């Protein structure tokens, strides 16, 4: 990706919303080809296209374990929202279960170097005339990322090692909001802020686990850390190629098992 080194004046020309912090702005890196997208809207529309192609989704259903057969995985044990248990069988199995991948892989004796790293986001509803940034802003000193999504501004940041606790710490979210207001002091939210917390599936080297397992029909697409949305489409294409027995078109040093 192209990146340009800009001084403070050039940063303000690209993003006028930074004028509120111009006295402390030294400069920045600008990636003109960088883009921002709404992951929820994308996946909802993608699910609709998948249904049209014949895909069946089992929502509110948990995979509790995988069953190993003579020639690989023979079934996945599942439990739905009513507590009803069953099995799903297929020719190939793809594990894309984020931070829970390591525990699920252990049911087959597989070891994945994935651990949950907790992060938070704050989403602000914006008025039509809000002085919000039009480009994505990353502030390394404040350790936050700001993205303008339609009529909302989302600010994300922090990294906590709290196991699988995904509860929202309001104090952490309030701190993220304060840091964003230091950069954009003129933003007036059009409503209440929405606080959220999630678990990032991190690997020691920040490289995702993509490829075939030691079982011929089990494949991995997990461990993307903070870059799940960024790498989603490319990773999906790569693992689809691997499952089909093709060499991935995307050259990337995926973690090999």
Predicted features by range, described:
Residues 1-9, 179-181:
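Dinucleotide-binding Rossmann-like beta1-alpha1 core, especially the glycine-rich loop
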Residues 5, 10, 69-70, 126, ...:
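C-terminal lid/capping helical subdomain adjacent to the catalytic/cofactor pocket in oxidative enzymes
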